[in-house]
Structure formats: structure tokens, C-alpha cells
Amino acid sequence: MAVLQWKLSRVIFVLLIIGISSFLIYFQFGNSFSASPALERLQDVFSKPSVQEYDYLVPLDEDMQGLSTTYHQATINEDDPQEPKSHEIVILLASDGRSSGNMAPETFNQCIENRINYAKHHNYGFEYVNVSQMNIPPVWAKMPAIIQTMNKHPHAKWIWWLDQDALILNTELSIQEHILSPDVLVEKLMKNEPMISPFSADLERLTPSSYTVDSARSLGLLISQDLNGLNAGSFFVRRSPMMALFLDLWGDKSFRENKVADHEQALLGYFVRYHPEIAAIIGILPQTLINSYPVGQPEMGWKEGHLVIHFAGCWVENRCQVLWDEYRERVH
């Protein structure tokens, strides 16, 4: 049954993409809309010959590929009893190779070290993609970087995107027992939760009232949200052709050139508001599970034992370096 549902979801998703493309071209942008090559290639994604039917991914165009470095290659262990197995999880960082938030240059290397230590401890992969040669803003480069990582790691089942201005603090927590193990995921997913979006003033879209292990397998994006909506500083993407197609759409330049949304997070909110089929593949996790902030209300603020702290917005008060140094001392 789960396999049948997965196949049906792929068919529905392809039809959805065609519908979205038609809607954007005809109704929203009219004659001023200039379709990008990515949109024109959507129909070809599933027409390519595939040696392995379920995991073939179309390679990115060369101008959308960054310099990729595997800082830790997980050891494949088919006897690993966990689901997913540790070597099936890849942590991903992509940036222009510089420090963020006006922090000292050495914080970039400290970030790399933080990810390497965690990946080694749990036998996860860790990939870094330098996107400096891409002619797009870094926040929009995360989508092609994820696809590139999917292609480089065909054994992976999940890619964990984590922003550069975040630290893994509790290195003893494994991703499986904390989030991705099927039973744990069903328990942690937020039910009947409004999906916050800057486009949703006239509509409250809720997450399902319940999940089963089978229904959770249909989710392709696991993310948290704050008061402003879905936050793309820390999220998990299932490696699949369907999600590669979604990422291709999410990163399409037509959306930013035609100012549909100010940034990639807002565009995700646009999809949630206007495309229920996309909303249906998104699972909402409690923010403090994967994306705690240094300050904030109890449902978003960091507490001892949390997996991650994300210094989102630290630049507003020019406190990025102070916070980084303070919490780096708490890594354990």
C-alpha cells in the first residue's frame, strides 16, 4: 500500500507542477513573464532513461553546480538496525565560503569543525558546497546545492540542510532517535497546526490531525516555523525524484525575477498557501527540535539539551559574534 501511495503521489506531483507552470505563465505574469530553462525542463525530468527506477535524479546544469567537498564520508553499514541507517543521512552546508553576520573569519572553519565532529560521532555524511561561482544570491543557491548533494550521495535517504549561522550543541543526540525514526517522527510531527505563511491572511491551512508511519513516508520536507512562517535555516529533505523536482521548482529564477516572494522562505510560504498538494508533502516539527533560537518564547527558545541553536536575525543587534562565542562553549 505504501508503494502504491508513493507512486500515486509522484503522478499527482508531476500534474501539479505542470499546473503551477501554466498558472504562473498565463494568469500571474502574462506577457511580461520570461520562463527560465528550469521550468522548460520540467516535462523532461521524468522522461529521461533511468537505470534505477526509483532513485534516478537528473544532473544539474553546470552553471548551477558548486564546488562540492565531502568532509566526512559515512561508512556504509547494512547491518545498522536503525531506520534510516546512519550512512543514509547526509548533513549539508552550502555558502560562499565566508563568515556570515559580520562574524570573524575563523567562525567558518569552526562551523565546518562542528559539523565534522557530529557526523563522525554518528557516522553521518557531511557535505560542503561552495556556491560562490553561482550567479544567484546564496539563499537561493541552497536548492541546487541540495540536488547536487542528492546526486553525489545516491545511498542517502535524507539530506539535513543546516545554515552556517547555526551550531549543533547536543552532539550525543542522534537524528534517528531524535527525529527520523518512523515511530518517533509520527510522534513529533505537529498535528492540527496552522502553517504560517505571509500569504495566508485569508486562509488557515492546517497540518493533518493525525499521522501514521505510512502517511509520514509521503512527507518529503520536514521543517519548523516561527512567528513569521516556515524557517529554512534547518530542515530535512527526503532524497527522491519527486523532491528533486520540487527543489528545482522552488529555486527557479522566474519567481525571484518576477518578485513573487522576497526570499526562499517566503516562496515556500507562497506554495503552502496556494498549492495544497505541496503543503501535503511538508511536515511541521516543533521549532526547538531542530531550530532553536537563542531568545524567544518557550516554543522557540533554546534550552539545555536541545540539538541545535540557530542565530537567525542576530545581525539586527550586531550580536552574532557574541552569541556564537557564547554558545560554542556549550557544545557537548
From Swiss-Prot:
<comment type="similarity">
    <text>Belongs to the glycosyltransferase 34 family.</text>
</comment>
<keyword id="KW-0812">Transmembrane</keyword>
<keyword id="KW-0325">Glycoprotein</keyword>
<feature type="topological domain" description="Cytoplasmic">
    <location>
        <begin position="1"/>
        <end position="10"/>
    </location>
</feature>
<dbReference type="GO" id="GO:0031278">
    <property type="term" value="F:alpha-1,2-galactosyltransferase activity"/>
</dbReference>
<feature type="transmembrane region" description="Helical; Signal-anchor for type II membrane protein">
    <location>
        <begin position="11"/>
        <end position="31"/>
    </location>
</feature>
<comment type="function">
    <text>Involved in the galactosylation of the N-linked core oligosaccharide Man(9)GlcNAc(2).</text>
</comment>
<keyword id="KW-1133">Transmembrane helix</keyword>
<keyword id="KW-0328">Glycosyltransferase</keyword>
<feature type="glycosylation site" description="N-linked (GlcNAc...) asparagine">
    <location>
        <position position="130"/>
    </location>
</feature>
<feature type="topological domain" description="Lumenal">
    <location>
        <begin position="32"/>
        <end position="332"/>
    </location>
</feature>
<keyword id="KW-0472">Membrane</keyword>
<dbReference type="InterPro" id="IPR029044">
    <property type="entry name" value="Nucleotide-diphossugar_trans"/>
</dbReference>
<dbReference type="GO" id="GO:0000139">
    <property type="term" value="C:Golgi membrane"/>
</dbReference>
<keyword id="KW-0808">Transferase</keyword>
<keyword id="KW-0333">Golgi apparatus</keyword>
<keyword id="KW-0735">Signal-anchor</keyword>
<protein>
    <recommendedName>
        <fullName>Alpha-1,2-galactosyltransferase gmh3</fullName>
        <ecNumber>2.4.1.-</ecNumber>
    </recommendedName>
</protein>
<dbReference type="Pfam" id="PF05637">
    <property type="entry name" value="Glyco_transf_34"/>
</dbReference>
<dbReference type="InterPro" id="IPR008630">
    <property type="entry name" value="Glyco_trans_34"/>
</dbReference>
<dbReference type="GO" id="GO:0018279">
    <property type="term" value="P:protein N-linked glycosylation via asparagine"/>
</dbReference>
<dbReference type="GO" id="GO:0006487">
    <property type="term" value="P:protein N-linked glycosylation"/>
</dbReference>
